[in-house]
Amino acid sequence: MFLIIFILPTTLAVIGDFNCTNSFINDYNKTIPRISEDVVDVSLGLGTYYVLNRVYLNTTLLFTGYFPKSGANFRDLALKGSKYLSTLWYKPPFLSDFNNGIFSKVKNTKLYVNNTLYSEFSTIVIGSVFVNTSYTIVVQPHNGILEITACQYTMCEYPHTVCKSKGSIRNESWHIDSSEPLCLFKKNFTYNVSADWLYFHFYQERGVFYAYYADVGMPTTFLFSLYLGTILSHYYVMPLTCKAISSNTDNETLEYWVTPLSRRQYLLNFDEHGVITNAVDCSSSFLSEIQCKTQSFAPNTGVYDLSGFTVKPVATVYRRIPNLPDCDIDNWLNNVSVPSPLNWERRIFSNCNFNLSTLLRLVHVDSFSCNNLDKSKIFGSCFNSITVDKFAIPNRRRDDLQLGSSGFLQSSNYKIDISSSSCQLYYSLPLVNVTINNFNPSSWNRRYGFGSFNVSSYDVVYSDHCFSVNSDFCPCADPSVVNSCVKSKPLSAICPAGTKYRHCDLDTTLYVNNWCRCSCLPDPISTYSPNTCPQKKVVVGIGEHCPGLGINEEKCGTQLNHSSCSCSPDAFLGWSFDSCISNNRCNIFSNFIFNGINSGTTCSNDLLYSNTEVSTGVCVNYDLYGITGQGIFKEVSAAYYNNWQNLLYDSNGNIIGFKDFLTNKTYTILPCYSGRVSAAFYQNSSSPALLYRNLKCSYVLNNISFISQPFYFDSYLGCVLNAVNLTSYSVSSCDLRMGSGFCIDYALPSSRRKRRGISSPYRFVTFEPFNVSFVNDSVETVGGLFEIQIPTNFTIAGHEEFIQTSSPKVTIDCSAFVCSNYAACHDLLSEYGTFCDNINSILNEVNDLLDITQLQVANALMQGVTLSSNLNTNLHSDVDNIDFKSLLGCLGSQCGSSSRSLLEDLLFNKVKLSDVGFVEAYNNCTGGSEIRDLLCVQSFNGIKVLPPILSETQISGYTTAATVAAMFPPWSAAAGVPFSLNVQYRINGLGVTMDVLNKNQKLIANAFNKALLSIQNGFTATNSALAKIQSVVNANAQALNSLLQQLFNKFGAISSSLQEILSRLDNLEAQVQIDRLINGRLTALNAYVSQQLSDITLIKAGASRAIEKVNECVKSQSPRINFCGNGNHILSLVQNAPYGLLFIHFSYKPTSFKTVLVSPGLCLSGDRGIAPKQGYFIKQNDSWMFTGSSYYYPEPISDKNVVFMNSCSVNFTKAPFIYLNNSIPNLSDFEAEFSLWFKNHTSIAPNLTFNSHINATFLDLYYEMNVIQESIKSLNSSFINLKEIGTYEMYVKWPWYIWLLIVILFIIFLMILFFICCCTGCGSACFSKCHNCCDEYGGHNDFVIKASHDD
């Protein structure tokens, strides 16, 4: 239970809730705690502790910690009894607020029994509600042993301890627990039983409890520290009952002196042994503040400015709107109807009061934590309104509610705003009183037939995916479109008017015509085409419900064409459910969003006070509807408040006005005085004299905190305290100068009391540092005689001076500079408010100042000044005629242009040819000359070829040749030859190209067939792999079930480990790192802007100085020495320079001097004085002469070089010395401060309640493997067998005239052969051998000439 986190009011605190005993209890003893006569004296280290148990040697240290107030009183809380206990001992003032902590001074009562020394003193208890739901710290002595425990005790209602030395009539009884209580800390420490006093220092800071202890010496040493994470609110000292202890015997009395601690700054002094020998509470007195400012226990004499004693509010103005109703938040939280995360509910509470303590007590709280808000600050605060959201928690999705989580609950149901000031409440309701309201808030879901979720009574519905649609969305297809579908025909129906039907197209495949292809297939969660699906996945925003669940459009509509569109219940996708029941209670989440902190009338009345009167004219503390501060109320007449407004703010968000609802009066709120207080301190005195500058003593006495002083009065400078008014008395020397000719004079008390009987050693007197002296009776010096040097010789010198008057203007994109394009950084940067706007505003002001400065300089230069140019000096050289073109590179539109322009691309067509090896050679041959067409005929495998593409010029040429050949045969027949060759060669080119394409087709077919074989093998391997995966996964699932059973008993340890991991891997770590980077960059940017402001100040000062020098040096001759150059000014020139002006000064500079005696004036006859005019009176050879101040030239004194005076007196006024504070701020130890902050950074651990019904599901991949096997068979049946294209071999035949010539030649050959055979002797011999073959020649008729043509 986290109720104990909050500080409970004193009136609600009780000691324990278990009545251990009722015997011998009464309410007769009305003792109240004694108040000590001694006060806290920290000068010897009382109340201090050694800082983090560290050692410091021979040093003085300023340290801020939890200390008692110097001069505070102690209260004795020791209670002693014998037989009876009083009920009043367990109520205030004995039951006290712990607040920051306490310092205890405990008497060690020593009793001797049977020659044995016993140590007795009371036990102290520190806790909050003192029951077993919170931790209680108990420090109990056991005769030399300190037993210190921090446990969840069940404290008795009337607890007490008994005397160990002599026994007691009663039995010790201070807690009772049925079992051993849960303890965070349990340890024993020893202490010195012989010590007279024991000192304890207990305090808490940011959830950590610290304990310090000492039994020798008064500074305490570190004992232990313990992180509780809660606030300890109360403490009390348990009564000690004993037979022997008597209040009448000093050595047997009990004393337990306690004083509260507060966060204060102390000055500590450590000696050479590291022991604290002296201490000062910096805010306890005026002297202590001076000691802390100087970090010295013996400050030097001087005047110091103080700040710690400026304001003392004398009253409190508290205002709340009366009679507001109760918000009744608890009634709404305990309502039996609980919504699901899908339809979470919201309620806004305003203009009412709520009691957070009561609220958390009336609901069964599991945890309560806050984000961007200290939950302890809710008590007593007011808000504009409180927004409360709630819903039941599905058990398996509890982790989704962690801040920054992206689980289903926050991505698709309810988004927690981590940037708002909010608190998260986890609570539960009894099972019998809960009704889960599972409702779909989506209107477009309900339009198309969404009914109920059909889940059990305690199941909570939540969305896994959210979808948004346009207002004209309809999930049904158009009947007129899908009626023509042959395959994959979807359901259809009539959509409502104004909506669009589901998009469906008729498509044609290789085997099926009119195949329907519709959108959002197979469903909107896993659609193939998310861009065309009208259902878009979305993430819920802050304050938004899920727009709608997904709809499987395949299940929307009917087979009837004229029915209205509706969807079946199983068409709605993307939702889940789980039970909210745990331990017979339903777990519920509620988010409190606090709007307008300290700016409204929705107030917590946990610490409610009564409305008070408005005190005017004095400094008061105020609490106006939760807004706190200090100020002075002054009644005014104001008509600018509306009836719903009651506070007036300035542009910086500070409250400056107030309208009282009770009296209808209006007030302006002025700040309390926080001005300058000067303390005049004389070394080794006991206190300083004070000067409240510009304040009347009447205001000081009513509003300013100070030690009562009998001496105060109003002076010209302000109210003076602890000094005597003696302004009629003057002194010539003063160590404590207050300014304006006044001084604080100090005299030792002993001598002053004898002469005047004045108790204060300080006097407020007039300061007159000099008296007039005379040299002789006739002519006397006025103001003294001095020795100076006057120039006697000069030389002309030149001097160059540059003054910057402007600079380049700077503008910065602050957001881009810090974050670039990182969205998370931009989101976090927005929380820094108007920082970036202020940066740009400052830079704009800087730029405006630059403009104004430039204008002022220009105006000064335009009036009677000629700018000099081309001045060659020893500091400058001409920079004319420098050529920068080589640095600029290529400029203009011609850079990077190619030989082909865009115009050429538009005017000419580009033709790309498939080249099998001769087109490139042809182009290289022609070189762009089309007339070389036939000259560049290429040979490809022995065949003459040309590219099959002709340009317009080539077509015209060949056509003309063919036409001429046909018109004038036979003379022009030769003109047709080029045309014929051109056609034939290009046909050859097409032929060889087709041959290559045929070969490529074969290669493609072979490669594709090989790919199909590879795919087939791959699917086969995949099927085998899936089979293996199935066996391995099932084996792992079996092992996982066994492992979960083994981890069941040890799950608590795992949860603890996860908590430790979460503490290191917190979701906020990324934001912390981003915030560090932003802080670093903002610091750099702020430093840069600060430098810009500093620079513009210098530039503005430089511009003013430049204008002054233009007016005094350039336009005229300056009488000032070393202002226009070095020496006496002669002439100055000015020239423009980058970002400024260059001055060239000419002056004459002294080279030699003469030492003379001079006097500021002379007194003649003792009653009339003269003073020199633009020179000096010098004493030369016992006579007085006059000389100029810039050149030694003595001349007689005359009425032309003197000024006459009525008297010879001199009035002296001297400015006071102001001592600047040169002390270096003392920062606390970095590691200690870091540990204090870091240990409070905690994370909410996820709910890791073990579900014993977890079962690892075995995978069944049989169906998937069958599908893959079928795919393999289908691929096998789709093997491509490309038909090979036949190749035709063409033989080129000879022309007909060649064949005719061959026949003629053959006949001639036969005739010659016949002649030889028949007409010569050789032929007769042959005939004889042929056996009359010639005779048979003409009768043979079977000779056949066979010709074979394969074509």
From Swiss-Prot:
Disulphide bond pairs: 20-156, 151-183, 163-242, 282-292, 327-352, 370-423, 382-603, 925-936
Membrane topology: Single-pass type I membrane protein
Record region (Heptad repeat 1): 1001-1051
Topological domains annotated Extracellular: 13-1295
Gene Ontology CC entries for this record: host cell endoplasmic reticulum-Golgi intermediate compartment membrane; host cell plasma membrane; membrane; viral envelope; virion membrane
Region annotated Heptad repeat 2, chain positions: 1245-1284
Subcellular location: Virion membrane; Host endoplasmic reticulum-Golgi intermediate compartment membrane; Host cell membrane
Signal peptide start-end: 1-12
Organism domain of life: Viruses
Miscellaneous comment in the UniProt entry for this protein: Isolate N2 belongs to genotype B.
Protein name: Spike glycoprotein
Taxonomic source organism: Human coronavirus HKU1 (isolate N2)
